[in-house]
């Protein structure tokens, strides 16, 4: 097959497309000839790591994905769960790591835009966004610039589009110096019986291009996301897409309108690999062929080649299969919204993917093989070495308890991230019940009493030290945060960020974390319904910390009965629920106070997580709990300080028990724990009920005053704590020493 004006296919050209020699040989055998330049680009896009999951697919099969409330699991644009009353929640999380490092503002904006499209492609109206951001060491010369650009990009897109950004994570670690992580999650609401899917159906059905015009931005974006970085990575700036939130808002409204009119047979957003991936997936999932005529594609630049049009990742675009009798009605709707509408092809019975341009056939490929016959690798992997348990008595504290608390709260890991989330509109739409800064966001479901509890969680240092326990803990933390606001955890989406899978130690981390995630999801009845894998997060051979971010969704039957972490009044008994051993391995205290980043992380007892969480949720629903907070990073005393600072009510705390050294008691990071306050009148009944179900519970103090006062220790004024807690990040971003 010879096409005019295309470069010859050479080994160098093949390599530049990210294809290994054996993969190219596979293409030659599949076609029985040399591919055209456009076909090479199509294979490069469909067979890269970002689109094909060729290194991860065999391991992803072990995740639990089913439950009675799951309508759609992995494999579609987003996951869908039933929340009753004919309503469904549609949600997913994806990464935009590589583009955000190269061009932080545009990389972040298009990450948000892409995940929003995944949600409304399914027929849902987006109601909330969350994100998890990982940056390098604050002292790295690029970190401040990257933080500024990414945060502005996330806020700029979400605010303009009109969806609240209600929660997230921000972390700093030197292992992200050369590869930041930008993980974006979107959540939407839809009618449970009106979910739209990507699979085309019917022969000779019109395939319609909708939305913004195609340009040269983003070409090879998916391929870039499937390779390591090096010192020249910033030269890849042209591969970063450019987003327009106002165009996306128009696209949302137009799509929802034609869905309501019954025009749509199948729909797929143009994300990674653009027109190529959307058309191939639509046809292959429907067991049909696709015939595209690129002469009909709306373009914003002159002289674009077939190769460029097929691989462009210009934003705010959709591909649909329409009912033929609804073409004119659909076109009128899109014209009304000022968006492009063009019939660019049709479905065919031949299971071929044919691309035409300027009178030439630029590509003629077997469509199923493009999608389902991508290389599948069971890459070598080695387990991470088992690290020793750190004995608390072997740790020499360098600071008093009070001094350590003040220092920890004024450091990057635990300081307030208000500077970040105040740049996001977290209340637009008027349905945000609990704002950022708590355990989980709570968003009201319109036209009823229900609410959604939303969170994103992961502790990468645990995953590095013990991938299996780290994977379990990421899920357990999401489950715990949803529980702490009164939500019933329903399902998760995951964003699996790892280094180069061709290194056995990295692949071992991936496999270990995935096994931990699967174990926790199974034990907690918390299925995975969508997700994303981002590999090759390395620069010059130095990989990120393994970061399997978990996005959790839970349901509250009555959002007015949600719990929050703030102490509500003086004189409330403070209860610690869960077992405390004083586990210091991989704790923030050990790392930031003792300068020791070592040891085994805390083990996660999933039975205890389930038992303790169910009890706490029951206390919230019964109206017994007046404040609730889970214990995680920084341990017990940090969690207590956060509760006190939230509303300016202090606490008088008992001394640590004699069996545990004080710094391990206050700063250990044992799992499956909650702090709950109750009215004095309910104390005896709470102890009785928890003892009956074998849930550990002790009283550790009383709320009151304006300081954190531990018996036998120096008291710490809340104003002093808040000053350090609130000032580190704005001071850092302002360049203050």
UniProtKB/Swiss-Prot annotation:
**Where ATP is bound, by residue?**
53, 92, 494, 531
Would you identify the family this protein belongs to, as annotated? Belongs to the FGAMS family.
Class in the EC hierarchy, top level: ligase
Query: A Pfam family this protein belongs to?
Result: FGAR-AT_linker
Q: Where's it found, cell-wise? A: Cytoplasm
UniProt-listed HAMAP family: PurL_2
Name the encoding gene, please. Answer: purL
Q: Which residues form the active site?
A: 50, 96
Q: What is its EC number?
A: 6.3.5.3
- Positions with a binding annotation for Mg(2+) 1: 94, 532
PANTHER family found in the cross-reference section: PHOSPHORIBOSYLFORMYLGLYCINAMIDINE SYNTHASE SUBUNIT PURL (PTHR43555:SF1)
Any one Gene Ontology molecular-function term assigned to this protein's record: ATP binding
Q: Which residues bind Mg(2+) 2?
A: 118, 269
What does this protein's UniProt record list under function?
Part of the phosphoribosylformylglycinamidine synthase complex involved in the purines biosynthetic pathway. Catalyzes the ATP-dependent conversion of formylglycinamide ribonucleotide (FGAR) and glutamine to yield formylglycinamidine ribonucleotide (FGAM) and glutamate. The FGAM synthase complex is composed of three subunits. PurQ produces an ammonia molecule by converting glutamine to glutamate. PurL transfers the ammonia molecule to FGAR to form FGAM in an ATP-dependent manner.
Q: What GO cellular-component annotations does this UniProt entry give?
A: cytoplasm
Q: Which UniProt keywords apply?
A: ATP-binding, Cytoplasm, Ligase, Magnesium, Metal-binding, Nucleotide-binding, Purine biosynthesis
Can you state the subunit structure given in the record? Answer: Monomer. Part of the FGAM synthase complex composed of 1 PurL, 1 PurQ and 2 PurS subunits.
* Biological or metabolic pathway of the protein: Purine metabolism; IMP biosynthesis via de novo pathway; 5-amino-1-(5-phospho-D-ribosyl)imidazole from N(2)-formyl-N(1)-(5-phospho-D-ribosyl)glycinamide: step 1/2
Please state what the protein is called: Phosphoribosylformylglycinamidine synthase subunit PurL
């Amino acid at each position: 097959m010879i096409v005019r004006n295309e470069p010859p296919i050479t080994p160098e050209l093949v390599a530049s497309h990210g294809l290994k020699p054996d993969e190219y040989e596979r293409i030659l055998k599949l076609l029985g000839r040399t591919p055209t330049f456009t076909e090479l680009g199509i294979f490069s896009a469909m067979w890269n790591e970002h689109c094909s999951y060729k290194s991860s697919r065999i391991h992803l099969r072990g995740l639990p994905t089913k439950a009675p409330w799951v309508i759609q699991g992995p494999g579609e644009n987003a996951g869908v769960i039933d929340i009753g009353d004919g309503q469904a929640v549609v949600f997913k999380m994806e990464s935009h790591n590589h583009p955000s490092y190269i061009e932080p503002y545009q990389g972040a904006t298009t990450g948000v835009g892409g995940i929003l499209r995944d949600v409304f492609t399914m027929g849902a109206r987006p109601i909330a966004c969350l994100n998890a951001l990982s940056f390098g060491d604050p002292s790295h010369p690029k970190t401040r610039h990257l933080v500024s650009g990414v945060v502005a990009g996330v806020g700029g897109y979400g605010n303009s589009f009109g969806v609240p950004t209600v929660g997230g994570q921000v972390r700093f670690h030197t292992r992200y110096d050369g590869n930041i992580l930008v993980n974006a999650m979107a959540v939407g609401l839809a009618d449970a019986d009106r979910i739209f899917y990507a699979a085309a159906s019917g022969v000779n059905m019109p395939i319609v291009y909708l939305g913004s015009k195609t340009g040269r931005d983003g070409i090879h974006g998916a391929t870039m996301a499937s390779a390591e970085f090096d010192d020249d990575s910033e030269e890849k700036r042209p591969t970063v897409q450019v987003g327009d939130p106002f165009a996306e808002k128009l696209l949302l409204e137009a799509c929802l309108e034609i869905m309501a009119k019954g025009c749509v047979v199948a729909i797929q957003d143009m994300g990674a690999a653009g027109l190529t991936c959307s058309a191939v997936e639509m046809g292959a999932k429907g067991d049909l062929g696709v015939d595209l005529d690129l002469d009909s594609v709306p373009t914003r630049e002159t002289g674009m080649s077939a190769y460029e049009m097929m691989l462009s990742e210009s934003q705010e675009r959709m591909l649909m299969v329409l009912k033929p009798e609804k073409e004119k009605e659909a076109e009128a709707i899109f014209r009304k919204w000022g968006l492009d509408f063009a019939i660019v092809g049709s479905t065919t019975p031949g299971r071929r993917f044919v691309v035409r341009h300027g009178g030439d056939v630029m590509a003629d490929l077997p469509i199923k093989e493009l999608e389902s016959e991508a290389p599948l690798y069971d890459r070598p992997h080695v387990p991470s070495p088992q690290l020793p348990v750190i004995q608390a008595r072997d740790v020499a504290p360098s600071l008093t308890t009070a001094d350590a608390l003040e220092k920890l709260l004024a450091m990057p890991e635990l300081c307030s991230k208000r500077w970040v989330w105040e740049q996001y509109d977290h209340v637009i739409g008027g349905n945000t019940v609990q704002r950022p800064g708590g355990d989980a966001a709570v968003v009201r479901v319109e036209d009823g009493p229900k609410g959604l509890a939303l969170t994103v969680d992961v502790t990468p240092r645990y995953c590095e030290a013990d991938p299996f326990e780290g994977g379990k803990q990421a899920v357990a933390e999401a489950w715990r945060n949803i529980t702490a606001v009164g939500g019933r955890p329903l399902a998760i989406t995951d964003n699996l960020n790892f280094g180069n899978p061709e290194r056995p130690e990295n692949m071992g981390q991936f496999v270990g974390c995935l096994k931990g995630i699967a174990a926790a999801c199974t034990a907690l009845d918390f299925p995975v319904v969508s997700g994303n894998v981002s590999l090759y997060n390395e620069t010059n051979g130095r990989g990120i910390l393994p970061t399997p971010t978990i996005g959790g969704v839970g349901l509250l039957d009555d959002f007015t009965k949600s719990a929050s972490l703030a102490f509500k009044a003086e004189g409330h008994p403070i209860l610690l629920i869960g077992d405390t051993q004083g586990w210091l391995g991989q704790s923030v205290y050990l790392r930031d106070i003792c300068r020791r980043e070592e040891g085994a992380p805390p083990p996660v007892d999933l039975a205890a997580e389930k038992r303790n969480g169910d009890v706490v949720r029951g206390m919230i629903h019964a109206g017994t709990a007046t404040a609730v907070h889970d214990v995680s990073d920084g341990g017990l005393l940090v969690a207590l300080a956060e509760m006190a600072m939230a509303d300016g009510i202090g606490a008088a705390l008992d001394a640590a028990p004699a069996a545990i050294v004080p710094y391990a008691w206050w700063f250990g990071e044992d799992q499956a724990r909650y702090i709950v306050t109750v009215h004095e009148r309910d104390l005896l009944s709470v102890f009785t009920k928890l003892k009956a179900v074998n849930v550990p519970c002790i009283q550790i103090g009383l709320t009151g005053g304006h300081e954190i006062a531990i018996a036998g220790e120096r008291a710490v004024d809340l104003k002093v704590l808040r000053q350090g807690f609130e000032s580190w990040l704005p001071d850092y971003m302002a360049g203050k020493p």
